[in-house]
């Protein structure tokens, strides 16, 4: 939820929709967020912007 709120700039109503979303949708979304965070971590280790 932190990533959605601070990085994606979701509003409180959008966060509520995300919280109440079906389990399969949340699993997909959180998997994509985890993948994006891994990419950003690897990029920062290489000295990228």
Curated annotation (Swiss-Prot):
This is Uncharacterized protein XkzB. It comes from Bacillus subtilis (strain 168). It comes from the Bacteria. The gene is xkzB.
């Amino acid at each position: 939820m932190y990533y959605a709120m601070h990085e994606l700039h979701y509003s409180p109503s959008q966060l509520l929709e995300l919280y109440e979303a079906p389990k399969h949708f949340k699993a997909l979304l959180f998997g994509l967020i985890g993948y994006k965070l891994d990419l950003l971590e690897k990029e920062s280790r290489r000295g990228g912007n």
